[in-house]
Amino acid sequence: MYIAGIMSGTSLDGIDVALVHVEGNGVDSKVELIHFTTVPFCKDIKNEILQALSIDTSNVQLICSLNFKLGLCFANAVEEVCKKADLSLEQLDLIGSHGQTIYHQPKQEGNSISSTLQIGEPAVIAYETNTTVISNFRTMDMAAGGQGAPLVPYSEVILYRHQTKNRLLQNIGGIGNVTVVPSHLSDKSVIAFDTGPGNMVIDDVCQRLFQLPYDQNGRIAKQGVVVDEILTYCMNHPFLKMNPPKSTGREQFGEEFVSELLKRFEKHGKENLLTTVTMFTASSIVHHYKEFILPYYEIDEVILGGGGSYNRTLVEMIRNGLKEEKCAIFIQEDIGYSSEAKEAIAFAILANETHHRNPSNVPSATGAKQSVVLGNITFPPIR
C-alpha cells in the first residue's frame, strides 16, 4: 500500500508529509520511505495557529475556520509529495493525518477531564485527494484511560528493533519523547514517555531574543555559557518529577513558561539564556534516562531524531551528559533513516494498522487500560 503520513507538530515548522510503501501489517510490516517533504505554513496560517493555541487570543470561530483551512493545507501537501514522487493520487491508498494539536490535557484538572483536540478537517482532505483518511489517533487511547501520547512507540518497534541490541529512540521535536525498544520484545518491555521540551523553548527564546526561527546547528548556543541559576529553575519544573507514563506540551512549556523565564533572568544576556535553555533540553533528557530507564535496562544505543538532532550544540550536550554510560549515540541519518521524516512515517504506519483493525497504542507507554485501534476513518465520496 502507498500511504501518506502527515504531521504538523508543536514546533510549527510546517507540514511534514512522508510517502511510504508498506507491505503487510503488524510488527513484521516492511516500510519503505518513497519521498518526504516539508511544506512551510504561510505567515497568515501560522499566525492563526498561534492565536488558536493561546487561551487569551483563541475563540471558537477561529478554531472552526482554521480546522477547514488546515484540512485544505494538508490536502495540498499530500498532492505536492505525490507529485514530487511521480505518484498519481489514484495510486495513493491511504492517508494518515495527525492534525494540528490545539490543546492537550492528559490528566483531569478541576472540572476539566483529560482530553485532546487536533484540527485539520479529514473530510476536506478526503474530498480533495479522493483518498480514505485516518485521523484523530489520540482520542481512543484517551478514552481507554491513556494520555494519548506518546503514539510513536509502535512505529519505532517496527522500524528500529534489533535482534541483539537494546535501543533508546529519542525524538526531539517541539517536545522530546523517548521509547525503549529492547531486543526481546514483550507487551510490557516497550516503555515510552515525554521527556519535556525538545525545541519548543529553544525556538521561542531564539525568536524573541534574536528574531530567528531557530538556532541553526546550535551556533548561537555555542557562544554562550550555562547559567546555573536558570538551569536549576528549569530543572525544578514539576513535570520532571512526575513518574512515567506522562506527556506534556505547550500547556506547560509554551509561551507562558518562556515569558516567565525571560522576565526572571533577562539580565544574564541573550546568548547565555539560549545556551542555558538548550542545556535544559539536554539535561531533561539525560535526567529521565538516569532516573527511569538506565537503572532497569542495559542500553546499547541511543538514536536521536527530530529537528533537534540537527542542533550540534544540543547533541554535544546530550553526549556529555551520557559520557559515563556504556552506550553509543547516533542520529537517524547515521543508521540510514531521516530525522525529519520520522513522525510523519509513524502516522503512515499507524494508519496502516487502523486500516487492518490492529491495535497500535502501547499501554505501557500511554497508561491506557488496554490496547485499542486508533483513529477515525473518513471515506472519500463515490465518483
From Swiss-Prot:
Key word Glycosyltransferase present in the record? no
According to UniProt, this protein's pathway is:
Amino-sugar metabolism; 1,6-anhydro-N-acetylmuramate degradation; Cell wall biogenesis; peptidoglycan recycling
Q: Which residues form a coiled coil?
A: none
What enzyme class is recorded for this protein?
Answer: transferase
Q: Which residues bind ATP?
A: G9, T10, S11, L12, D13, G14, I15, D16
Which one of the record's GO molecular function terms can you name?
Answer: kinase activity
Matching SUPFAM superfamilies: Actin-like ATPase domain (SSF53067)
- The yes or no answer to whether the keyword Kinase is present is yes
| GO BP annotation list | 1,6-anhydro-N-acetyl-beta-muramic acid catabolic process; amino sugar metabolic process; peptidoglycan turnover
Entry EC number(s): 2.7.1.170
Q: Pfam families given for it?
A: AnmK
Q: Which reaction does it catalyse?
A: 1,6-anhydro-N-acetyl-beta-muramate + ATP + H2O = N-acetyl-D-muramate 6-phosphate + ADP + H(+)
What's in the keyword line of the UniProt record?
ATP-binding, Carbohydrate metabolism, Kinase, Nucleotide-binding, Transferase
Listed PANTHER family: ANHYDRO-N-ACETYLMURAMIC ACID KINASE
Q: Which family does it belong to?
A: Belongs to the anhydro-N-acetylmuramic acid kinase family.
Please explain the role this protein plays, according to its UniProt record: Catalyzes the specific phosphorylation of 1,6-anhydro-N-acetylmuramic acid (anhMurNAc) with the simultaneous cleavage of the 1,6-anhydro ring, generating MurNAc-6-P. Is required for the utilization of anhMurNAc either imported from the medium or derived from its own cell wall murein, and thus plays a role in cell wall recycling.
Entry protein name: Anhydro-N-acetylmuramic acid kinase
Q: Which organism is it from?
A: Bacillus mycoides (strain KBAB4)
**Source taxonomy lineage?**
Bacteria, Bacillati, Bacillota, Bacilli, Bacillales
Gene giving rise to this polypeptide: anmK
